[in-house]
Amino acid sequence: MAQENTLHCTRAICYSGYRDGQDPSGEILPTYGQVKQDLMILEGQWQSLRLYASDNHSDTIMNVIKSENLSFDVMLGAYITAEQNNPHCPWGGVYSDEQLAKNVEHNQVQIDRLISMANSYPDIVSCVSIGNEAAVGWTDHLVPTDRLITYSKQ
């Protein structure tokens, strides 16, 4: 990952690229060709992409950017799950102790993958994001702030 002290301001957009019948569960993901088609449309309009996860689909996106010599930089995310209950979440945020323990293990795998991908694409990844709305009071995937800080220091 590029080691700069400041973030630069660019035209940025969140990108997922999922089409009808595709979803982040990993069953059916966008192909290299579909991602390339999307990014060719976005190039010239946007300089930065935000990806919510460091998964197989994100790896395809990074591969397209690198292989096609596209000019995007990426904010790469780690999509983490609840490590504590949140009874204030309107759509449910209470889990068993067993599930929360599994989530902690899952989250560390996600952080490890984030680090690996950022190191694999140092000229593309400009910054990282740990969790998506994981610290707001209404979320169903609440993670304590001290854990987010611990993850960020890895």
List each model region and its residues.
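A conditional alpha-helix N-cap/helix-loop micro-motif detector
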Residues: 28-32, 54, 107
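Substrate-binding cleft of extracellular glycoside hydrolase catalytic domains
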Residues: 60-154
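Substrate-binding and catalytic surfaces of secreted/luminal carbohydrate-active proteins
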Residues: 1-4, 36, 51, 149-154
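Conserved residues at the C-terminal ends of beta-strands
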Residues: 16, 52, 131
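Boundary/entry segment of secreted carbohydrate-active catalytic domains
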Residues: 1-37, 41
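Conserved, mostly hydrophobic/aromatic
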Residues: 13, 49, 128
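Catalytic domains of carbohydrate-active enzymes, especially glycoside hydrolases
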Residues: 33-57
